[in-house]
């Protein structure tokens, strides 16, 4: 793969700032941006936790940004639920909504408006669904997802590697040849390089789809 010159940090800073302003779900006026060696840092304040996540995603979308560091704080209004109320609200979410996690598999704790999820589920998509189901609750400043994975199906490392490699070829036929898949037990390691952060995320998501995977170490780098 051909490597070209990296874009200067000052240009990336301008691009990230413009992308934040372009994102309708983000109030960019109170968000500061700095970039060092392609690594963007966002600081300042937002009104909700989902807005904070949207800001971080916006920065990651900018071509040339390799890492996005989070120094954004959530600034709540006056009528903020307490930790006990937030805990009850989070548990109600799992009781009353069609969240794709096994019943009674997730436990919730809230301290200083930071919500912690514990428990075990078979798939990564269920782990993510549990987190997404409560991340938008009013008054939440952050979510720690400590849910572990206990797959209901297993596969031999060679079989798992072959399935992931085949899926990568289907999803990204041109770039998949630059991606190396390693499997150690139930843990997958991705190495190599791709042009965009979106393709890097796509490769990781593909690895998570393989039955039996409990961890994905994404070491892929971006070419510019």
Task: Label each PLM-derived region with a short phrase.
Residues 1-224:
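N-terminal targeting leaders
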């Amino acid at each position: 793969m051909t490597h070209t010159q990296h874009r200067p940090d000052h240009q990336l800073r301008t691009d990230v700032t413009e992308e934040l302003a372009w994102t309708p779900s983000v109030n960019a006026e109170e968000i500061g941006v700095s970039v060092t060696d392609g690594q963007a840092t966002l600081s300042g304040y937002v009104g909700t936790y989902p807005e904070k996540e949207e800001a971080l995603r916006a920065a990651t979308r900018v071509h040339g940004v390799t890492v996005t560091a989070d120094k954004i704080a959530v600034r709540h209004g006056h009528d903020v639920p307490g930790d006990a109320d937030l805990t009850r609200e989070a548990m109600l979410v799992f009781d009353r909504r069609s969240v794709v996690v096994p019943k009674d598999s997730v436990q919730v704790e809230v301290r200083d408006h930071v919500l912690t999820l514990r428990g075990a589920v078979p798939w990564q998509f269920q782990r993510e669904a549990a987190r997404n189901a409560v991340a938008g609750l009013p008054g939440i400043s952050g979510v720690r997802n400590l849910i572990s994975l206990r797959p209901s199906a297993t596969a031999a490392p060679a079989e798992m590697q072959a399935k992931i490699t085949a899926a990568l070829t289907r999803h990204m036929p041109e770039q998949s040849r630059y991606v190396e898949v390693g499997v150690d037990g139930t843990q997958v390691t991705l190495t190599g390089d791709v042009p965009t952060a979106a393709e890097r995320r796509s490769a990781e998501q593909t690895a998570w789809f393989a039955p039996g995977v409990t961890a994905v170490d994404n070491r892929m780098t971006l070419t510019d």
